[in-house]
Amino acid sequence: MSTLRALRAVLCVYAVGIAVALAQLLRRLRGDFRPPVLPPQPGRVAIVTGATAGIGRSTARQLARLGMCVVVAGNDEHRGQEVVSSIRAEMGSDRAHFLPLDLASLASVRGFARDFQALGLPLHLLVNNAGVMLEPRAETEDGFERHLGVNFLGHFLLTLLLLPALRASGAEGRGSRVVTVGSATHYVGTVDMADLHGRHAYSPYAAYAQSKLALALFALQLQRILDARGDPVTSNMADPGVVDTELYRHAGWVLRTAKRFLGWLVFKSPEEGAWTLVYAAAAPELEGVGGRYLRDEAEAEPLGTARDQELQRRLWAEGLRLTGAGGGDSDGVAW
């Protein structure tokens, strides 16, 4: 990637981050930072990826407080078991489980789906939260650029593998939900179908933005497919905003310095960042409502490109090809 294009990617991502952070500051100064009030969710079962830390951990805990049974999915068993233990201690219940999941490995994704099936639980909610951000170029076990592989392709396959359980658990007036975590960086992203893996030109900023736009395209295309099939499942995007998490460890020194000194003021805490995810997961007004982009517990408008149905179809087909889910017989996925 040329120096000019790489610099443009950095500046665009920073500009979006600054705009979101300032909006959060204004909201905080207005006293508008309040958690959503949601009804109890007894009997519901949720899977949260990346629930061993940050937004995912806070999301899992908040869902458990609503009465859901939560499956903590992550690649750090020690931290995962700590989250499960804390939920069980707080709730006085054993309705929390840890299952290993490495989204950088399609074999691990398939193994997770089998492990979940072995639990014998229904599935009412899938929160696609885990992700990587601004990492130097590296590839997953399957040869995918890591942002694309972890953020998009891993969740793509996971969702397809779990859709039969989501369908079976949903009912008219009480459907299942898929909540995919988005980012405002998708507004400055492009999906390069000719070089998805950044082998010819790479910028961690462009790669992250591309992965988030890919997730938006995926979430909206998924809703179109669910609608066509008449499935009792909805698919929405939830943008947590700029949140103080470990993801910034690969960011440039400017962003890390700003986070260190101003994070307490302009960044959301993981607990606050989880509010939009939990709202998408449990708000009664979203029953049967899909294809939405949610931010600050309200509907927002995604980038117009995210609604490009031709690009949605092309990316979906490429996702099927890359993950091997196209035929579906071996994994129980049929389209």
Curated annotation (Swiss-Prot):
Quote the PROSITE patterns the UniProt record gives: ADH_SHORT
Keyword DNA repair among record annotations: no
List where in the cell it is found. Answer: Lipid droplet; Secreted
* Catalytic residues of the enzyme: 208
| Catalyzed reaction equations | a di-trans,poly-cis-polyprenol + NAD(+) = a di-trans,poly-cis-polyprenal + NADH + H(+); a di-trans,poly-cis-polyprenol + NADP(+) = a di-trans,poly-cis-polyprenal + NADPH + H(+); a di-trans,poly-cis-dolichol + NADP(+) = a di-trans,poly-cis-dolichal + NADPH + H(+); a di-trans,poly-cis-dolichol + NAD(+) = a di-trans,poly-cis-dolichal + NADH + H(+)
Alphabetized, the UniProt keywords read: Lipid droplet, NAD, NADP, Oxidoreductase, Secreted
Gene Ontology cellular-component terms listed = extracellular region; lipid droplet
Name the GO terms of the biological process aspect.
Answer: dolichol biosynthetic process; positive regulation of autophagy
The positions annotated for binding NAD(+) are 55, 208, 212, 245
Specify whether Oxidoreductase is a keyword of the entry: yes
Q: Per the annotation, which location comes first and is thus the protein's main one?
A: other
Task: Read off the SUPFAM superfamilies from this record.
Answer: NAD(P)-binding Rossmann-fold domains (SSF51735)
Q: What does this protein do?
A: Oxidoreductase that plays a key role in early steps of protein N-linked glycosylation by mediating two non-consecutive steps in dolichol biosynthesis. Acts both as a NAD(+)-dependent dehydrogenase and as a NADPH-dependent reductase during the conversion of polyprenol into dolichol. First catalyzes the NAD(+)-dependent dehydrogenation of polyprenol into polyprenal; polyprenal is then reduced into dolichal by SRD5A3. It then catalyzes the NADPH-dependent reduction of dolichal into dolichol. May also acts as a positive regulator of starvation-induced autophagy.
Q: Recite the other comments.
A: Autosomal gene, which is the ortholog of human DHRSX, located at the termini of the long and short arms of the X and Y chromosomes.
Q: Which family does it belong to?
A: Belongs to the short-chain dehydrogenases/reductases (SDR) family.
Q: What is this protein called?
A: Polyprenol dehydrogenase
**Biological source species:** Mus musculus (Mouse)
